[in-house]
């Protein structure tokens, strides 16, 4: 195994207006910084949204749930202002972590469960990401629980994936439900009758929002007081689902933004707004380096995302990935990534007939890393079981 600790600086995005090194430039009183938590249900596009906001493909993304398994900090600087985003895992249950993600040990699953709330603990603002095409008009009950626990932190509702919505007018009545018909400044949201739901599919309107739901039942009030004192990850999935089963929205949103993280629609407006509300403060991250993550960890994330996108879930979630070689050869960074499988047949499945699947995984990884690091590199992937190399599909 060869891993050299190189002075490897990923040439990631940096705005042109900040031309000098952050380390060489003392913090000025006029600098501004806003720390944001990006939270939401699984697979709503939190990572792609973060990438779009920082103009860098930092977080690995895939079409599968649970691509992000820990908090990832990312930043962007413009003039004297820095935005620091914490992209968090989707809010899931303990059983999901064990059964779907195949994380059976307490330590391996802890970050998936706890990191969404950890992202909120130091946040000055919250971005709640909602899939505009998702069936059902409600904010996920785990997200609602966190919003109630951190109600003192200002929040923004981000309606993502609007490029997939056939009729944009459908979004207004949906947002009315998700915001309880108003924003935190008591501004009313006016709408007209329209169908809502996945791509225009009509949805039953016998829904009760939390603004009209005023529980008088002492049992409910007692349950609320008890659960709101506990971190979300310490509440069972059934507890939060039962608590918020008739509550669909959150009245505390300051603003609502409609965006497409895929094609960039609405992203500039959201970023500009966040820049405009940033308070004075010292920058938290180095200018020109939008993350504190190591290059090796970003490579592992990229390989995992490519495996998730190309391999059946029952195999993809069980593999372990490590970097076995990371070495400069001239101007080219040579990387060897090892995909460790639980069973030999899993390795054969990942390699695919004639090596087609592993070739596709490698193509995706190299394409992403080249875009991320902006330098010459080559990532070679090997598949192993119990330390033995699997060379072909059987």
Swiss-Prot record:
Swiss-Prot/TrEMBL keywords: GTP-binding, Membrane, Mitochondrion, Mitochondrion inner membrane, Nucleotide-binding
PROSITE patterns: G_ERA (PS51713)
Region of interest called G5, as start-end residue ranges on this chain: 259-261
GO CC terms, sorted: mitochondrial inner membrane; mitochondrial matrix
Binding site residues for GTP: 40-47, 87-91, 160-163
Compartments, record wording: Mitochondrion matrix; Mitochondrion inner membrane
GO terms under biological process: positive regulation of egg-laying behavior; regulation of aerobic respiration; ribosomal small subunit assembly
Chief site of localization: mitochondrion
Region (G2), start-end ranges: 66-70
CDD domains according to UniProt: Era, KH-II_Era
Region (G3): 87-90
InterPro entries reported for this sequence: G_ERA_dom, GTP-bd, GTPase_Era-like, KH_dom-like_a/b, KH_sf_prok-type, P-loop_NTPase, Small_GTP-bd
Function summary: Probable GTPase that plays a role in the mitochondrial ribosomal small subunit assembly. Specifically binds the 12S mitochondrial rRNA (12S mt-rRNA) to a 33 nucleotide section delineating the 3' terminal stem-loop region. May act as a chaperone that protects the 12S mt-rRNA on the 28S mitoribosomal subunit during ribosomal small subunit assembly. May play a role in positively regulating mitochondrial function. Plays a role in fertility.
Protein name in UniProt: GTPase Era, mitochondrial
Species per Swiss-Prot/TrEMBL record: Caenorhabditis elegans
Lineage: Eukaryota, Metazoa, Ecdysozoa, Nematoda, Chromadorea
């Amino acid at each position: 195994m060869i891993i050299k600790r190189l002075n490897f600086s990923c040439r990631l995005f940096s705005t042109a207006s900040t031309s000098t090194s952050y380390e060489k430039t003392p913090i000025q009183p006029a600098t501004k910084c806003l720390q944001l938590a990006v939270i939401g249900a699984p697979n709503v596009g939190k990572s792609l949204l973060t990438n779009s906001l920082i103009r860098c493909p930092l977080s690995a993304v895939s079409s599968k749930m649970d691509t992000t398994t820990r908090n990832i900090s990312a930043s962007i600087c413009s003039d004297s202002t820095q935005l620091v985003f914490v992209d968090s895992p989707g809010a899931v249950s303990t059983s999901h972590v064990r059964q779907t993600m195949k994380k059976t040990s307490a330590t391996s699953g802890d970050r998936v469960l706890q990191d969404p709330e950890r992202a909120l603990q130091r946040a000055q603002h919250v971005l709640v990401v909602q899939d505009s095409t998702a069936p059902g008009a409600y904010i996920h009950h785990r997200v609602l629980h966190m919003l109630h626990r951190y109600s003192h932190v200002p929040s923004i509702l981000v309606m993502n994936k609007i490029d997939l919505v056939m009729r944009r007018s459908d979004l207004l009545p949906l947002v009315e439900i998700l915001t309880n018909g108003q924003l935190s400044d008591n501004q009313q949201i006016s709408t007209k009758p329209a169908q809502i739901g996945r791509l225009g599919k009509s949805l039953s309107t016998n829904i009760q929002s939390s603004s009209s739901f005023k529980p008088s039942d002492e049992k409910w009030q007692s349950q609320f007081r008890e659960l709101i004192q506990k971190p979300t990850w310490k509440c069972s999935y059934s507890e939060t689902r039962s608590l918020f089963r008739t509550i669909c929205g959150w009245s505390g949103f300051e603003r609502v933004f409609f965006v497409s993280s895929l094609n960039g629609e609405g992203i500039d407006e959201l970023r500009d707004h966040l820049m405009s509300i940033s308070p004075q403060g010292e920058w938290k991250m180095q200018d020109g380096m939008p993350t504190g993550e190591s290059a090796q960890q970003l490579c592992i994330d990229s390989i995992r995302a490519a495996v998730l996108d190309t391999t059946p879930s029952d195999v993809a979630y069980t593999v372990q990935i490590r970097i076995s070689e990371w070495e400069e050869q001239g101007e080219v960074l040579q990387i060897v990534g090892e995909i460790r499988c639980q069973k030999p047949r899993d390795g054969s499945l990942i390699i695919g007939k004639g090596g087609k699947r592993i070739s596709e995984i490698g193509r995706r990884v190299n394409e992403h890393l080249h875009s991320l690091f902006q330098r010459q590199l080559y990532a070679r992937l090997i598949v192993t079981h119990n330390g033995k190399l699997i060379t072909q599909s059987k």
